[in-house]
């Protein structure tokens, strides 16, 4: 079945390859992809940095359909699940704060990220999480993000990162264009996943 064809309002079937990522997942082999980014801590911060990150995600959710969709399993698993728009994404769950114990070494950061990466994503929610990690001895803040491979392929992951991060200190206003494509995968050229 064509992965772009809709099965009702807001329902999009998973491709066979994307569904395979769900079926192959096990506790020993999570099927999410992840990134770890280090940022300079903003000067004169008056509130928790995680609140800024949540506001950023909230402002840009409309640019990233993969962050809004959750799985809708088919009855008796007779077919691949569908993606359905979650409506109200719980950013308290999806964007969490962690603080490293002193001294806040890179080894401690890597150990924490390894533990977070080993935890499976909740399939009843959109298949992603972000963790704002403070307490690094360098004064930096780390942001670890993970998203299920069923939700994005490589090119869609790059598009998600571009939708969320700015390359300049002053963010560029991003407003959705009328009748804009829903995602990079809807922009006309098939993604790697769709070509397989």
Identify the role of each PLM range:
Residues 1-196:
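Non-catalytic N-terminal regions of enzymes
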């Amino acid at each position: 079945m064509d992965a772009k064809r809709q099965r009702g309002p807001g329902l999009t079937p998973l491709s066979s390859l994307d569904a395979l990522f769900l079926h192959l997942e096990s506790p020993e082999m999570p099927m999410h992809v992840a990134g770890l980014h280090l940022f300079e801590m903003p000067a004169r911060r008056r509130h928790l940095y995680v609140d800024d990150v949540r506001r950023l995600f909230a402002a840009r959710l409309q640019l990233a359909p993969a962050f809004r969709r959750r799985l809708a399993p088919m009855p008796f698993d007779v077919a691949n699940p569908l993606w359905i728009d979650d409506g109200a994404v719980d950013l308290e769950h999806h964007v969490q704060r962690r603080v490293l114990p002193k001294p806040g070494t890179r080894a401690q950061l890597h150990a924490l990220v390894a533990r977070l990466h080993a935890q499976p994503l909740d399939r009843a929610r959109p298949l992603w999480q972000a963790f704002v990690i403070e307490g690094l001895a360098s004064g930096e803040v780390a942001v670890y993000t993970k998203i299920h491979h069923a939700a994005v392929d490589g090119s869609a992951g790059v598009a998600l990162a571009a939708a969320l991060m700015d390359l300049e200190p002053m963010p560029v206003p991003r407003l959705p264009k009328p009748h804009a494509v829903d995602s990079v995968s809807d922009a006309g050229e098939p993604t790697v996943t769709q070509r397989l």
